[in-house]
Every structure is written in structure tokens, then in C-alpha cells.
Amino acid sequence: GLLLSGGSDPAGRVRLDRFVPAIREIKDSTPLKINAHVGLTPRGELESLVASGVDTFSVDVYGDDETVREVLGVSAGAQDYIGVVRDLIDLGAEVAPHICVGIRGGRTGHEHDAVRAVARLAPKTLVFISFIPTRGTAYESCPAPRGEDVVSVIRGARSALPGTRLLLGCMRSKRDRSWEVDALRAGLDGMVLPSDETVRAASALGYAIRKKGTCCALA
């Protein structure tokens, strides 16, 4: 399968609607599965993308308006992103909201509110990722969030969303792996690219290990 993504325009839209014919052709002529990463996409465009055959939609969600405005620089609020998730669920699409822990320069704060907002929609899947300091950006000198902060958010999500599949996605710092087992214990159902040590520990804890070579939202 593949992840279909891209940069957003000043309004926060990831303009995937222009690729609807190509998506239809891919779905009609290949067995590939498609995960579309959308931003503040209007409902009409979402309808076209759903009808094109997209298998899963990934939507970043946030817990407060300040985080949206500082990090993304758009004139929108947290509820606008939750609204995209709601629209996709209403349209019968598979959707995997994503919460980035520490996205505000490594600082945490919005995440638990984001979990509560997602819990009201009870999606089948919720993905956690975490901030990675990136050279050339405003946050390049900021620290990655602590592992214990990521684990705390996962634990809260497990309590709030007992029937939702919780996954740890690919975008996270791999420098410190010591907290991965704690994340499993907190309630994760799956993890992208776990360390070998984490896999061995999970097996010892009684987890059934299933390897899948695909985007976690499609797994």
C-alpha cells in the first residue's frame, strides 16, 4: 500500500481532490491499499475521496486552538480538525485520527484534551506519534517529549477508548527505546518499527506478535 500526503495550503487543506481520477485508476487496476493524509478538507472533497476508493484516512487532531495556531499557523481551531474526523465517520469511511505528543516544541499539554475529543467519536483506530526536532525549523533546538509523557497519553487513551485499537506510529524519535515496553503495558495494540528488545519483551509478556509490512493505519 501507500501513504498519500502532501503539504497544506494556507487554509490548512491538503489538496488531494485533484488526484481523485488517479486514485480511482490505482484502485481499479492494482491491489494497493491507500491511506490518505488529509487536513482541513471540505466535506464535498471528502465525499469525492471516499468514493474514489481510499481505504483509510489519517487526520491529525489537536486538543486546543493555541497549539493549532502556533504550530500550523492557520486560522482554524482544534474542533475544525475533529470535524473532519466526524465527517469521514458520517461518510462511512475508515479513519485513523493521529495525536502528536509534544508537537508544540516538545511541550505537552494539548494531548489529553485531544484524546477526550476523539473519545466522543469512538473511532476504530487511534494513532500516536511524537515530535521530532528537525533542523531548519523553528523547533530545531527543542527536545523531543519524554517517553513517560507519551506513555501517560496512551494510558489515558486506553481508559477513555476501551474498544479502540491504539497504535504507536512511525513518526517518533528512535534514540531512546527504553519506554516502548511501558507503552505496550499502557494499552497499545500495535507499534511501528519496535526495537528487537521490545519485540522480545512483548513476546515474554504474552503478546501475540504479528508482523505487517504496511502503513499502521492500514494494518
What spans do the regions from the language model cover?
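Conserved Radical SAM active-site core
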Residues: 1-71, 75-95, 108-112, 120
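Hydrophobic faces of well-ordered beta-strands that scaffold small-molecule active sites
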Residues: 2, 34-36, 57-59, 95-99, ...
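Active-site beta-loop-alpha junctions enriched in small/polar residues
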Residues: 7-9, 37-41, 62-64, 100-104, ...
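Short, small-residue-enriched loops and turns at beta-alpha junctions
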Residues: 8-14, 74, 102-107, 134-139, ...
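Weak global preference for isoleucine
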Residues: 23-26, 34, 82, 89, ...
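Auxiliary Fe-S-binding modules of radical SAM enzymes
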Residues: 30, 112, 116-219
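Low-complexity, flexible helical/coil segments
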Residues: 35-42, 70-75, 91-100, 131-137, ...
